[in-house]
Amino acid sequence: MQKASIAILLAGCLAAAAQAGDITGKVTLESTPGSRKVGQTKGSAGYEKGDVPAPSESEVEDVVIYLEGEKLPSTPLTKMSGKNTILQKNKEFLPHVLPVTKGSKVYFRNQDPFPHHVYSVSQPGSFEIVKHGSTVRSQQFDGTGEVEIFCGIHTKMNAYIMVVDSDYFCSPSRAGVYRISGVPAGQYSLWLWHPRLPRPAKKSITVPASGSVNLDLKL
């Protein structure tokens, strides 16, 4: 009788695990980027305003797509600290946008032969790494939202860390194609963040118990 109960329990767990689908689609950016006025350099009056020029290539890979909803597992978020790295190379931050889960560490690795002054004054995670040389430095981000990063020495350097409270997130490929896999069946809020959006955009989506649902997105 006990073996039968265990078998029934295992069958129920397998059925629950199987009730998950994928979200797929394509993201299209319809607006044209322009330069932005942002806080950058640190002068005698503190962090001053300056221009960050418009990017010279496609920005679709800079979109961050993430899910929120009651059906998502309540287990602790995955911390992929080993993969959360921002390089400083040729006076650029690479990648330009890095999505991470709340509580993750981000590692800053300088590959230039000269130092950088990495900092952010964003509310979710302000920090400062002065005269960052070849030593790899890290910063943990416990708040959610957009963290905008600059270099106090090279004023055109700019990047973003988007901290999300969900394990279900992704960024599109260069062609704009995206996929979020293994989402438990149910209704969710799908959020889209991009550096040029004044605030994240929200879409409602229902994920099936199996298979996939397609949602193309335009920004």
Model-predicted segments: where are they?
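Bacterial N-terminal signal peptides that target proteins for export
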Residues: M1-A7
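Extracytoplasmic copper-binding redox domains, predominantly the cupredoxin/blue-copper superfamily
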Residues: Q19-L219
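Bacterial N-terminal signal peptides
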Residues: A7-A15
